[in-house]
Amino acid sequence: MANRRQPVQHRAQQRVYRQSQIRYAPGAGGESEISCCVKYSVFSFNVIFFLLGFGLLLFGVWAQIEKNTFVNMLSKASKLYLDPTWPLLIVGFLTFIIGFSGCVGSLRENTSFLTFYSTLLGLLLIAEFSAGVFAYACRDQLDNYIRNLLNDVVVGYRDDPDLQLLIDSMQETWMCCGINGADDWDRNTYFSIEAREVASPEAGGVPFSCCINSSKLEFKNYFCGHGVRLKPESHMAAHLAAQRVMAHTASIYTEGCLPKLQLWLNNNMLLVAVSMVIIAIIQVLGICFAQNLKSDILAQRAKWYYTH
């Protein structure tokens, strides 16, 4: 019985050995069908994406843990779309998966991973193209959606540290205040004029990032926006009231951030379009290289089976 098992085990070992040698065995002409240039180009290119995606993923998870969002996720489910770290997590995860499948597929010459890699890139390319067409066709609805989203961002300014940092950076960079103007901050519970009833120090004010030259100061004055939107008392003399309004108005940015965003997009439309085209070209090249490598691997396997 033992003698019968030995030939079977021997043949099984030989079969495993031969399969493991497919990618190393030269063809009938003594040369491999697999291009080392294509193989290691795909691998090197995707190592960058793998590391970039892994870094974004780690940073996003760390940011969520720092805010205890994972613990309170269900209670804050309605406001998850306002959390700026979620797009970071999604982009990081997709980049990580693409880079990982590309690295494994090219280095191990695994056709399944290369097929998954090409399919994922293709689906992503289709999604990007569809999103671009949809954004152009429904630009009016998209403008209203962005406006409503920014209004929600103003309302939730104090609810999320990352969201607060994002808004402050935007207002300081573009030298703007609110969505359409400084009065938009009246929608926020802390900055609304009605907050005077609870003696809020921020009532009728704006965030410090609305203050002119706030980003140039060595030490930020976080109280510079307090009460700048409060109307003068009725008993105050007209000229004093006018001076107070002018002084407060001169200390903050009065233009909204949405017009600034629209102006930036109009001035940099060519740059945005070129960036999108470059990203699409990189994806197409990734698909072509992966399919080329897959064809080489299949050709090498066919040649090896034919000669053995």
Swiss-Prot record:
Source superkingdom: Eukaryota
One GO BP annotation of this record: regulation of mesodermal cell fate specification
UniProt key word rRNA-binding: no
Quaternary structure note: May interact with protease sup-17; the interaction promotes sup-17 cell membrane localization.
Family statement drawn from the similarity comment of this UniProt entry: Belongs to the tetraspanin (TM4SF) family.
Entry keywords, A to Z: Cell membrane, Cytoplasmic vesicle, Endosome, Glycoprotein, Golgi apparatus, Membrane, Transmembrane, Transmembrane helix
InterPro entries reported in the protein's UniProt record: Tetraspanin/Peripherin (IPR018499), Tetraspanin_animals (IPR000301), Tetraspanin_EC2_sf (IPR008952)
Effect of gene knockout: Viable and fertile. In embryos, loss of protease sup-17 cell membrane localization. No effect on tsp-14 protein levels or subcellular localization. In a tsp-14 (jj95) mutant background, reduced RAD-SMAD reporter expression, a reporter system for the sma-6/daf-4 BMP-like pathway. In a tsp-14 (jj95) or tsp-14 (jj304) isoform a-specific mutant background, exhibits vulva morphogenesis defects resulting in vulvaless or protruding vulva phenotype, impaired egg-laying with severe maternal effect embryonic lethality and smaller body size.
PANTHER family reported in the protein's UniProt record: TETRASPANIN (PTHR19282), TETRASPANIN 26A, ISOFORM B-RELATED (PTHR19282:SF431)
UniProt GO molecular function: protease binding
Cytoplasmic side: 1-41, 108-112, 290-308
Membrane topology, as annotated: Multi-pass membrane protein
Extracellular side: 63-86, 134-268
Lineage summary: Eukaryota, Metazoa, Ecdysozoa, Nematoda, Chromadorea
Subcellular location: Cell membrane; Cytoplasmic vesicle membrane; Endosome membrane; Early endosome membrane
Tissue: Expressed in the germline.
Protein name: Tetraspanin-12
Matching Pfam families: Tetraspanin (PF00335)
Residues modified by glycosylation: 213
Listed transmembrane segments: 42-62, 87-107, 113-133, 269-289
Cited function: Functions redundantly with tsp-14 isoform a to regulate body size, embryonic and vulva development. Functions redundantly with tsp-14 (isoforms a and b) to regulate cell fate specification in the postembryonic mesodermal M lineage and male development. May regulate BMP-like Sma/Mab signaling by mediating protease sup-17 trafficking to the cell surface.
Gene: tsp-12
GO CC terms of this entry: cytoplasmic vesicle membrane; early endosome membrane; Golgi apparatus; late endosome membrane; plasma membrane; recycling endosome membrane
